[in-house]
C-alpha cells in the first residue's frame, strides 16, 4: 500500500513573486484573510544542505480549504517565473517519520529536511511535490488557519 494512502490534506502550497499582490488577488477571488506574512529567518536543510533562509510565508483558510503562500526565493524549492503558481500539497500523518522514510525508500527525493526528519518536502520521480507534516507542525498550521477563519468572520460581520 502507498504510504500516502488515506492521509489528510492540510493545505495547498502556493509560491508567488510578490506577496502583497498575490494576497490581494487571492483574497478577492477566494474571500481569504491572510495571517502572518512577516519575513523570518528559518534554519532549514534544503537540497541536503543546512541553510538559513529569509522567508515570507502567509496562511489563510476558507474553512473548507487551507492555503500556504510563500514568496519566491532563488535557488530553493520556492521558485517561480509566474505571478502565482500552485506549488505543493501538504499531507498530515501521525506517523510522519515512517511516511517520510517510506517515501525515500520509494525513490522520492527529499528537498526539504534532513534525512530522518519527521517532516519535509518530497518530489516523486515524475515531479509531484508533496509536503509531509506530523502532529506538532499540524497544530502550528491549524492555529494560523483558525486565526484566518476568525478574521474572515469578523470582516463578514462588519460588512
Features from the language model and the residues they span:
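A short, polar/charged loop-to-alpha-helix boundary motif
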Residues: 139-148
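Vicinal oxygen chelate
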Residues: 9-17, 58-65, 74, 79-97
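Generic beta-strand structural signal
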Residues: 87-89, 118-120, 128-130
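Short, flexible helix/strand-to-coil boundary loops that buttress conserved ligand/catalytic motifs
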Residues: 73, 82, 103, 144-145
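Short helix/turn-capping signatures at newly exposed starts of structured segments
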Residues: 2-11, 68
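Core segments of cupin and vicinal oxygen chelate
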Residues: 4, 15-63, 98-99, 105-115, ...
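Catalytic micro-motifs at enzyme active sites that drive phosphoryl/nucleotidyl and oxygen chemistry
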Residues: 78-79, 110-113, 119
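Conserved short beta-strand elements that form part of the metal-binding/catalytic scaffold
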Residues: 33-80, 122-139
